[in-house]
Regions:
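Short aromatic/hydrophobic "clamp" motif used to bind/position activated sugar donors
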Residues: 93
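Glycine-rich, basic loop-to-helix element that forms the pyrophosphate-binding segment
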Residues: 71-88, 110
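A conserved acidic beta->alpha catalytic loop
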Residues: 44-53, 73, 97
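Conserved donor NDP-sugar-binding/catalytic core segment of glycosyltransferases
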Residues: 105-138
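Conserved nucleotide-sugar donor-binding catalytic segment
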Residues: 86, 126, 142-224, 228-229
Length: 240
């Protein structure tokens, strides 16, 4: 897909009733140090708390860089993603949900530099700190993770934390019709992208993935392989 805006990265942020966390999430994005322009596209799914007001305050501070959709009607996770994704204009897309945050100011630069110099890769992701808020404990993700993988690896399990991903926009054209029916968007979007290039892992931890009881889209269901048959090209995938 051509990018005529000059934007290197669109950061896609979905949020709903996350007034406790959204400031930290947005701040971590706006503190990124890059040699390229990027935008933050926020889809606030009709929050009933102060999330929308907080987002609007940030948008007033950075009107040229933050695009805010304060939805009047709750769309649900999948439709909120679909509609927010459609507004992203960058060459690459990163994801930071409203209760997660980035910890490395060079995260976007490091990942964009990799994709710039490795055109045969569709996606790169990195290690994250899993923060279990209810217990107050932390752990590092992706122990023993291979540095380079492809769609056949990803079809077995989703090892990409959303808050860590950077991927090329428009590899597969428009989102397919079935996309609205999957339980969560993350696995499906990574599989769609992986049809068109390899996946690279950066061992450096650069974000916090917050896990807590009120996270409305953490591990939504166990059938994470729903619709894989529609996503994975059998000619390019080798499952044992």
């Amino acid at each position: 897909m051509n990018n005529n805006t000059g934007l290197k990265v669109s950061v896609l942020m979905l949020t709903y009733n996350q007034e406790r966390y959204i400031n930290e999430a947005i701040r971590s994005v706006m503190l990124q140090e890059t040699n390229f322009p990027f935008e933050l596209v926020i889809g606030n799914d009709a929050s009933t708390d102060c999330t929308g007001t907080i987002c609007a305050d940030w948008q007033k501070k950075y009107p040229e860089q933050i695009v805010l959709f304060n939805r009047k009607k709750n769309l649900g996770l999948q439709q909120n993603f679909i509609q927010t994704y459609a507004q992203c204009r960058g060459q690459y897309i990163a994801i930071c949900e409203g209760d997660d945050f980035w910890t490395d100011k060079r995260k976007l630069q490091i990942q964009a530099d990799f994709l710039d110099t490795h055109p045969d890769y569709s996606t790169c992701f990195h290690r994250v700190i899993n923060y279990y808020e209810d217990r107050g404990t932390k752990s590092l993700s992706n122990g023993g993770q291979k540095q380079d993988t492809d769609i056949s690896d990803l079809a077995r399990s989703n090892y990409i934390s959303n808050v860590s991903a950077l991927f090329r926009r428009g590899l597969f054209g428009e989102l397919p019709e079935w996309f609205a029916r999957v339980s969560t968007y993350d696995y499906a979007i990574h599989l769609l992208n992986a049809q068109f290039g390899k996946i690279h892992y950066i061992k450096r931890p650069m974000a916090v993935y917050r896990q807590h009881g009120k996270a409305i889209w953490s591990e939504a269901g166990t059938d994470r392989k729903l619709d894989i048959a529609l996503v994975v090209d059998r000619k390019s995938t080798r499952l044992n």
